Amino acid sequence: MLQRFITSLMLLPFPGSALAALQNQDAPQHMTCTVAQPTESMIGAVQLQKTEAGTIGVESRSAEILANEKAYFTGNVIIQRNGQWLSTSKATIDQQRGEILASDGITFNDGYLSVTGDSLSLDLNDDQAKLYNSDYRLQNHNARGHAELLSLSRQEVLLQDSSFTTCPGETPAWQLRAERIEINETSDFGEAWHARFELFDVPVLYLPYFNFPLSDARKTGLLYPTFDSSSNSGFEVEVPYYFNIAPNMDATIAPVYMSERGTMMKGEYRYLFEQNAGQFNLEYLGNDDTRIANKKRYLWHVQHSAQINQDLSFYLDATEISDDNYLNDFGSDFAGRADTHLYRVAQLDYDNENWTAQLRTEDYELIGDYRSPYRTLPQLSIDYNTGDFTGFSASLYNELTYFQNQDQTREYATRAHIEPSIQYRFEKPAFDTEAELSYLYTRYWQESPDANITEEVTRTLPRARVRARLHLERAIELGDSQYRQTLSPQIQYLYVPYENQQNIGIYDTSLLQDDYHGLFRSRRFSGLDRIAEANQITYGVSSSLFTQNEREVLRASIGQIYNINDSRTQLFASDEETTTSSNSEWVADINWAVDENWSIRSSIQYDTELNTTRKSQTAVEFRKDESNLIQVSHRTATNILNNDIEQVGTQAVWSANSRWQVASNVFYDLTHDRLNDAMVGIQYSSCCWALRVSAYRRINRDLEPAFSATQINGETQFDNGISIQFIISGLASDSSGLINMLEKSTYGYRRPFYLSN
C-alpha cells in the first residue's frame, strides 16, 4: 500500500529554477523542434499536492526513519517541494548532514529543467545538487544534451563532459561537445570550454572557448560564420563576434580570412540615445597579396543623427575607401559595386512655423576616371514662407555657397542667390489652379584658369508659371466589378527669358531626369548654375481606377512639353545649340495591379521627331507573399554617357515548402550580348539548422589596372564566387536571408510599383 510521509526538513529552493528565464528561440524558416515533455510515468501515478514553504513532501511505497536523523524511502519515491519534484526508486534524507541522496534512476523536473540520471546528491546547506550520467532538457528552450556530471546551483547549471543541441533524434544534426558548459540564469547565455562542434557526429571545429545566447535577447558572443569562395579573393571565412556593451550600445568585430589576399578586420560600433543615434564602421586589410602597389585597403563609414531641440537637428553621413577598386573587390553595405561616387554630408537644420534654415557641407569621393565634382564648404540656406492668406502666399529663399574642387586646375567659386516669390492657389473639389511669379538673382565670384569663365557674374531672371488641373471622377463597371475612375487633365505655362550663362562654371548642376510628374517642374536643371530658357506649354492627363474599398488598381499618365520658342540654355557649351525645335518627347507611364498577386509597371519617353525611344522600363511581378515573388524587367536608354543601354533581368525568391527556398537574379546586356550579373541561392531549413548556398557571376570593374590588372587583351573579366553559410538555431543570431541577398546584389531588388493601397 502506498504510504505518504511528511518531514519537517528545511530545504532551500531547488537550483533548477536557474533556468526559469530561458526563452524559446525560433529556428530559421518558421520551424521549431519539439521537445518531449515529462509524462505521468516519469513521476508516478500519484496526485502531487503543494506543501508548506520550507518542508519536503515525500511519497513512497515503504519508508524507514531512524531517530529523526535519517529517512530511507524505496519504491516509487517522489520528493516534492513547491512545485519541484524528484522521482526515484531509492532516496535517503540525512537531516544531520543536510543531504538528500537518490539512486536507481532519477528524474528531476521543476517546469523549466527536466533531468534523468543514475543518481543525485543534494547538499541542503550549500544549495547544490549533483546528478550523475544524466540527460537534460531545457523545456522552455529547445535544447537538450547529456552530461556525465550535472551540477545545479541557484544561478547556474554546470555541465561536465557534456553535449548541447537543439536538434531531435539520437544522432542530432549538430551538437556541441565540451569539457565544461555553464548555463547562466542572470545573463541568459551559455559558455563552453574545450568544445568541439560536430555535424552529424563528425567533428568540424575545435573551440577552446565559446559562448552562445539562449534566447532572442542580444548577447555577447559569436555570430554565424560565413564561408565564401571567389575568383577574386579565393577561399573566404568570416567569423563575427558580437559585444552587447549596454542596452543602447553594441559592437561587432569580424576577422575575414581570404586565401588570396590575407586577413581583413571589420568592426562596427552602434549607439542609441534619447535624442541621438549613430554608428561607426571600419574595414582594414594591411597587406593585399594580390596587388603590386597600394597594398593597404580600408573603408570607414560614420553616421550620426541628433535632435538638439524641438527646432534644431544635426545629421552626418560619410564614407571613404582607400582606392577605386575597393567596392569591386570587397563589396559594402554602404555603397554598391557599380557606384561611381561616395557621398558625404554634414548638415545642421532649423525648422519652425515660417522659417527653415540649413547649414551644410557636402563632398564626393569619385570612384573611377570621372569629372571631379565640387565640395560645398559650406552652404547656408534660409527660407521664409508667410503661409496662406486667402489663397495668396509669399516666400523668400536665400542661399550662400562656397565651392571648392579637388582638382587644383579648375575653378573655385562663391555663389549668392536670392529668390523672392509670390504664389496664388485656388482650390475647388473639381479643379485647382496655381500661379507663381519669381525673381531669381544670382551673384558669382569665380576663380578659374578657363578663359571662358568670368571672375564676377550677376544673373537676374524673372520666372512666371501658371498651372491648372481638373479633378473628374465617375462610377464604372468592368465585368462584375464596380470601380471609381478618376481623370485629371492638367496644363501648365512656364516662361523664363534667355540669358547666356556659359561664363558661369558648373558646380552643382545637372540635367534632371524626366518622368510624367517631372514634365510640370519649373526647372530643367538641378542646382542654380543653369536656369533654362522656357516659353512652353505642358499638357498631360492622368487616370486611376479604385476599387470599392479604395484600393488603387490602375494608374496611367501621358504628357508632353510644347516649346513655343527654342530653348537655347545648355549645360555645357559643347552641347547641342537647342533642346528641340518644337515638341519634347512624349512621356507615359502605367501602374497596374492586375490582381492580388500580379503587377505591371511600364514607362517610356518617346521622341516623335526622331521616331526613337529615349528611355523605357517595364517590370512584371508576381508576388504570392513576402517570401514568394518573381519579377521580370526590361529597360532601354539611349545616349547615356554616349552609350546605349538595353538590358533584361529577372529576380525571384520562392519557397517550395517549409524547408526549401531558392532565390536568383539574372541581368543580361542585350547591347553587348553578355551576362552582366547573376546570382542563385538555395536554402534548406530544418527545425534546428539551415544551410544556405549561393553562387554569383558579375563583371569585374577594374578601375586601377596599374595595380591589379583584370583586363586581358581588352576583354571584360568576370568575378565568380560561391558562398556557404551553416545556420544553427540556439547558438547565435542570423539577420541575413535570401531576400537580403537580392537587395545587396549589384542590381538590387526594388519593388517598382507605386499604387496607393
Curated annotation (Swiss-Prot):
One of its GO terms (cellular component) is transporter complex. InterPro entries: LipoPS_assembly_LptD, LptD, LptD_C, OstA-like_N. One of its GO terms (biological process) is Gram-negative-bacterium-type cell outer membrane assembly. It is found in: Cell outer membrane. Residues 1-20 form the signal peptide. Keywords: Cell outer membrane, Membrane, Signal. Transmembrane segments: none annotated. Component of the lipopolysaccharide transport and assembly complex. Interacts with LptE and LptA. Belongs to the LptD family. Together with LptE, is involved in the assembly of lipopolysaccharide (LPS) at the surface of the outer membrane. This is LPS-assembly protein LptD. It comes from Idiomarina loihiensis (strain ATCC BAA-735 / DSM 15497 / L2-TR).
